[in-house]
Amino acid sequence: MAAKALLLLAAASHAFITPVRRLRPMQPLRAVPLDAIELTTHTLAANSALTSTADELAGSLFGASLLPWLAMLYWLKHPKTQAPKGVCFGLTYLLAFVFGSIPAAIGAGALYGASLADADWLHGAAESLLAATNCVVVLGFRDALAGKDDPDRLRTAATYWAGFAILSCFVVVAGNLMTMDAAAHAPWLNGVGNLDNVNEPINALSIPTWIIHTSSLVEWLVAMGLAWRYADVIGRKEWKGVTWGMLPLHTSGIVACCYHLFYNAPELSWCVALQAGCTCLGNTTMAFAMYRLAVASGWTLSDGRSDAEALYARLTQGVEAEAAETETPSLVTAAPSSTTASLLGWEDLGDAWALDSDAFFLGKLLALSAFLAYLVKYTPPLIPGSIVDGWAGAGDGVHSGAAALVIVVPTLLNCAKWYQRSQEGAEFVGDI
């Protein structure tokens, strides 16, 4: 119950405030008709009700998503599964993001009465823990495919990154106290890389925060591809099921980016509930995939009972469980499929850059993520004002429809790619 309560608090990170655009040059004042004022009042009331409903639903779904994730970790880390230790640590490290988001969300609400999504410096720091998780998972798979397993260096790097994320928040707080200036929208890492004189809503994500989001999407796709490749290399097809299990979580990331792309618009508050739903579904599919993997590796219900009894004894009597020795699966020679050799998708970057050092590999991912961040952040401000005005008056239905396309199209393409890749001898002729 305590863990669920904490996750319900984390759902506060998905509350919304209305985006406020920066002031434009002085324009002649116009009289506003009374019926327009009445319509605006009704719209705001409807958006507020939708936001409250979405928040409540998201809180329940986020809370429900913890149990399947813990179940997934149990089967993943079971000695019989013989999963790469770096991957085990990476997926466990995700809990740092989950519980790191809680104080960030509470801080945004307590300090500014805003959502975490609208407090960039807290938002970026918290989300960076998710990006770090994905990096560790990718590096864990790279190590396993290279025939080595060194989780200690990954633990050290992840610990340093967590410290950096916390330090970045303290730097903003210290600067705040010195200037006595409220910083609800203070950019994370001082907005390094932001372009000046660009007309954006005040709650637009900074470049560093956008890079964190785009890198998370790219890294997760790369991890999906590496899991698929790992299945071929060790001759265990159940790892391909893990790739399928990861797919809803990638869609969850797309939903989050879509919401930020539209500047956290109140009429798109359904994105928060959808993101929570995709997270809960993804955690469940991941748990099922790991269950299949564990069963194929020899896990039985009697193992589960023994582990439960050992855990109970450890909690009540302080009895330490005996450490079970694990063996690293032997690598087998497997001819990559034609889709893998063609290197057509983001997920194939792991194979394309397999010979790079970790530093060079991550540097390439960072450069790619930065390019995508600039693209999504600064393309909307380039749209002519007449089109922007027309869009503003198009109505909530049009806005929701456009957001739905941003979410559904890449998700369907992702599903199509993995479906065609799973067909024997099939060759995918597209990209995401």
Question: What is each model feature region?
Answer:
Residues R21-I432:
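N-terminal plastid-targeting presequences
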Residues A10-A12:
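Long, compositionally biased alpha-helical segments
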Residues A15:
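Active-site histidine-anchored catalytic micro-motif
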